[in-house]
A protein has these predicted regions:
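Bacterial N-terminal signal peptides
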Residues: 1-5
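Acidic, serine/threonine-rich low-complexity disordered tracts
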Residues: 9-111, 129-285, 437, 444, ...
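Solvent-exposed loop/turn segments at secondary-structure junctions
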Residues: 85-86, 181-182, 341-344, 365, ...
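Acidic/charged, solvent-exposed loop-and-adjacent secondary-structure segments enriched in E/D, K/R, S/T
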Residues: 106-122
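Secondary-structure boundary elements
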Residues: 123-124, 288-363, 371, 433-438, ...
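Active-site rim recognition segments
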Residues: 205-218, 292-293, 336, 378-381, ...
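Catalytic cysteine-centered active-site loop
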Residues: 344-347, 351-352, 385-395
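Catalytic cores of peptidoglycan-degrading enzymes
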Residues: 347, 363-380, 385
Length: 454
């Protein structure tokens, strides 16, 4: 059996096969080597993940390569390269005593951001790297942070031993790693070797030899589709979801700690989940663009992947909005424009800057949402991203849209459908800028019960 040890300071490359629905879809590599950095003895940790999966009927090829330089158990530099369908994002993070200075190159668009350094946990580039560095988990809980290169944000993780499970006839208590985005289970042998890794989105990793891991993935037909694997089918079945004006659901999942309430979504905690009541927004008078901008200045600012201060974005937003001064009408003009110029393409597996989205005019819901939010802010419309679930055909899929402040309410706008009506089948799980809206929880063991539909 090939295993990966959690013993700190491993100096050899270790390989995993990556599987989705039992089919191998890629491989992962972890290695730690000795090096010299700034004249000091250091450790260089590298992780590489290569994936070939399906997404909404498209084929997605993706590579994530990261490197961390650590001196005396303290990270000094992290580098990430994410590539998919000819697009790349590179992130270099340099650590000081108090902050992280991150430089981002997203498809040629350069930006910088500063992240305060947390005081309650170390920072790693991957949970397996974190456990390698802190192998003594037995009998206690570990807290640490993962640097997410997609959102350029820190994700607080908690690791602890779970209840024992049967693993090929052997009773093993997995190490459970809770991340805001998903839950990972790491199964260890009695010697502390990793024998399997499972995630809440159905992706599994198993140790392989180098030759096995690098062996070409055979084309067996349709690739496993991540959108279908993570889809949630409610009971009873939804009728005519796109014309739904009110929906009351009971949502439960192993890792669902809470959900945001808002002007059109109300949340109540129940014994085994959350009761969610969603009302379709109605056309209401809204305030002027200047009034709304004055009331919500925070949501006018440019942020990661949302370059609303770019002169080209400002000029385009002005052209779309024209002489319109009503916030809701201006937002609908932008939503309609984005829908008219974009073509769905799920083959690009990385988050992209709005400039690149506008240039290529292809993408998935998150690309539509990023471009819509950027143009709204460029037009001085307060806007934030929202993500969660939506049902267009009776099944709930993960989705993204935007919300615009129209004077008294945050009104949702979805640029994917051609029709302007926003159905009550949008279930919001997170909101904000990219770092929070797209760090939502992928639900584990999710169940949705339809309590009422109108």
């Amino acid at each position: 059996m090939v295993t990966l040890s959690l013993a700190a300071g491993m100096l050899e490359a270790q390989y995993f096969g990556v599987y989705l629905q039992g089919q191998r879809v890629g491989y992962a590599l972890y290695e730690t080597t000795r090096t010299v950095f700034a004249g000091k003895s250091a450790e260089r940790s590298r992780s590489l993940t290569v994936l070939k999966i399906g997404l909404i009927g498209s084929e997605v090829d993706m590579k994530i390569d990261s490197e961390t330089i650590t001196v005396a158990n303290r990270p000094l530099r992290m580098r990430f390269l994410t590539s998919s369908a000819g697009r790349t994002q590179t992130v270099e993070a340099r650590f000081s005593e108090t902050s992280i200075e991150a430089s981002i190159n997203n498809g040629g668009t350069l930006s910088n951001t500063t992240i305060p350094l947390p005081k309650d946990g170390r920072i790693y580039d991957d949970p397996i790297t974190a456990l390698q560095a802190q192998p003594g988990i037995a009998g206690k809980e570990l807290n640490f942070y993962i640097f997410d290169p997609s959102s350029v944000a820190l994700m607080k993780n908690r690791a602890f031993f779970g209840e024992k499970e049967d693993m090929d006839g052997v009773s093993i208590a997995p190490v459970i790693v809770e991340d805001p985005r998903l839950t990972t289970k790491i199964y260890l042998s009695g010697k502390g070797d990793i024998v399997k890794v499972g995630t809440s989105i159905g992706v599994e990793m198993k140790p392989l030899s180098k030759a096995q891991a690098l062996e070409e993935i055979k084309n067996t037909g349709t690739r496993p589709d991540l959108a279908e694997v993570t889809a949630i089918r409610p009971t009873p079945t939804l009728n005519n979801p796109q014309t739904t004006k009110f929906l009351k659901l009971k949502v439960s999942a192993e890792n669902l700690r809470g959900m945001p309430s808002g002007d059109f979504q109300k949340i109540e905690k129940s014994d085994s989940g959350w009761t969610v009541s969603i009302t379709q927004p109605r056309a209401e008078p809204s305030k002027s663009i200047s009034e709304c901008a004055k009331a919500q200045p925070t949501w006018l600012k440019a942020s990661h992947l949302i370059p609303s201060d770019n002169p080209k974005m400002v000029a385009l937003a002005k052209k779309i909005v024209g002489s319109t001064t009503d916030t809701a009408k201006a937002a609908e003009k932008i939503r309609t424009h984005v829908n008219s110029i974009m073509t769905p393409d799920a083959g690009i597996g990385i988050l992209r800057d709005a400039n690149e989205v506008l240039k290529t005019r292809v993408g998935v819901c998150r690309d539509y949402a990023i471009l819509t939010a950027t143009l709204c802010r460029a037009a001085k419309l307060p806007a934030k991203l929202a993500s969660g679930l939506v049902s267009f055909d009776g099944t709930f899929y993960y989705h993204a849209w935007v919300e615009v402040f129209t004077g008294s309410k945050w009104v949702p706008y979805d640029s994917i459908p051609s029709a302007p009506e926003f159905s009550a089948t949008h279930v919001k799980l997170s909101e904000g800028n990219v770092d929070t809206a797209f760090a939502f929880t992928v639900l584990s063991g999710a169940k949705i019960e339809v309590l009422e539909q109108k």
